[in-house]
Amino acid sequence: MPRLKDKYQNDVIPAMMEKFGYKNKMQVPKLEKIVINIGLGEALQNPKAVDAAVADLMAITGQRPVLTKAKKSVAGFRVRQGATIGVKVTLRGDRMYEFMDKFVNIVLPRVRDFRGLSPKSFDGRGNYSVGLREQLIFPEIDYDKIDKVRGMEVTFVTTAKTDEEARELLQLMGMPFSR
């Protein structure tokens, strides 16, 4: 069993029940999935960028990413309907807990001048998103093998109804929020 899942069941659930007064442990919010997305604007000019991004995400998550395609054509961005404009991975279950553990304990400390995550990035429905500027902060990415520095969005989807509950959940699971 992943370390973080164990921590959730033994430490987080009792703490959340006490703080929010849940009567049943099934009411306690939990992490549902983690979605990692890389938007590829440059894929329109350089089709090889997609393969590189797929390789990066596969190394980071250990799972094959899905190509995201444009829903509509946008002349201003020179985007055709159906053109590949990004790659994403959805992690659930044990892989999700393993990724979050690695994200909190290895990846975030490697971010340059990191002062904690902004507590303002909740969406109002109990989900938290964080943007990363480069993929180099992941230990699986080899500096010599990358063609271009790419950013990505990491979204933590929880079953929490409010941002306050979601923040408490993520904080108890080790997310370093700034004050």
UniProtKB/Swiss-Prot annotation:
Single biological process term from Gene Ontology: translation
One MF annotation (Gene Ontology) recorded for this entry: tRNA binding
Any single Gene Ontology cellular-component annotation: ribonucleoprotein complex
SUPFAM superfamilies attached to this UniProt entry: RL5-like
Entry keyword set: Ribonucleoprotein, Ribosomal protein, RNA-binding, rRNA-binding, tRNA-binding
Domain of life: Bacteria
Sections of the chain in a coiled coil: none
Keyword rRNA-binding: yes
PANTHER family tied to this protein: 60S RIBOSOMAL PROTEIN L11-RELATED (PTHR11994)
UniProt-listed NCBIfam families: PRK00010.1
Function as written in the Swiss-Prot or TrEMBL entry: This is one of the proteins that bind and probably mediate the attachment of the 5S RNA into the large ribosomal subunit, where it forms part of the central protuberance. In the 70S ribosome it contacts protein S13 of the 30S subunit (bridge B1b), connecting the 2 subunits; this bridge is implicated in subunit movement. Contacts the P site tRNA; the 5S rRNA and some of its associated proteins might help stabilize positioning of ribosome-bound tRNAs.
Assembly, per entry: Part of the 50S ribosomal subunit; part of the 5S rRNA/L5/L18/L25 subcomplex. Contacts the 5S rRNA and the P site tRNA. Forms a bridge to the 30S subunit in the 70S ribosome.
Protein family according to the UniProt entry: Belongs to the universal ribosomal protein uL5 family.
Protein name, as recorded: Large ribosomal subunit protein uL5
Name of the gene: rplE
